[in-house]
Amino acid sequence: MTPAVSPAHTVLFEAKARKGISFEQIGKAIGRDEVWVASAFYGQAKFNEEELKKLSEVLEISSAQIVKELGDQWFPNRGLGPVPPSDPVIYRLFEGVLVYGHPIKAIIHEKFGDGIMSMIDCNINVERKPDPKGDRVVVTFDGKFLPYSKW
């Protein structure tokens, strides 16, 4: 099940499909990473006006309309879909956090102290790694460590 996105975001997906281009290609054209671009297409990140104008050129859609709908007045409503997720790929990521979340948390605390890994100041990368037993998916979360403050 694909999560519901706004009509403006649906226009982006339709234009992307019509052009037959990838998030990576769009990202290179507007100066952003493919994961960030995909996130913005789902309404989970916010394009600035310059990015929207570049995006409209890449996708060959109306700049005025997309800026009107996704410009300064629009803000993301982050978090899509049910918990637990029903999509198999998203569920496996969710399962990874359920199974390995506490061990990862313990190691973060051992290496950094009492705090969290930011998902706001975070870069995410998805790579394909060849392997004789079947290609591997490598997902990297590169988040800033934020120590808890004391007062």
From Swiss-Prot:
It comes from Coprinopsis cinerea (strain Okayama-7 / 130 / ATCC MYA-4618 / FGSC 9003) (Inky cap fungus). Catalyzes the reaction of cyanate with bicarbonate to produce ammonia and carbon dioxide. The active site is at 92, 95, 118. Signal peptide: none annotated. Pfam families: Cyanate_lyase (PF02560), CYNS_N (PF21291). Keywords: Lyase. Belongs to the cyanase family. One of its GO terms (biological process) is cyanate metabolic process. Coiled coil: none annotated. One of its GO terms (molecular function) is DNA binding. CDD domains: Cyanase_C. It is an enzyme of class 4 (lyase). It catalyses: cyanate + hydrogencarbonate + 3 H(+) = NH4(+) + 2 CO2. SUPFAM superfamilies: Cyanase C-terminal domain, lambda repressor-like DNA-binding domains. PANTHER family: CYANATE HYDRATASE. Its EC number is 4.2.1.104. The lineage of its organism: Eukaryota, Fungi, Dikarya, Basidiomycota, Agaricomycotina. This is Cyanate hydratase.
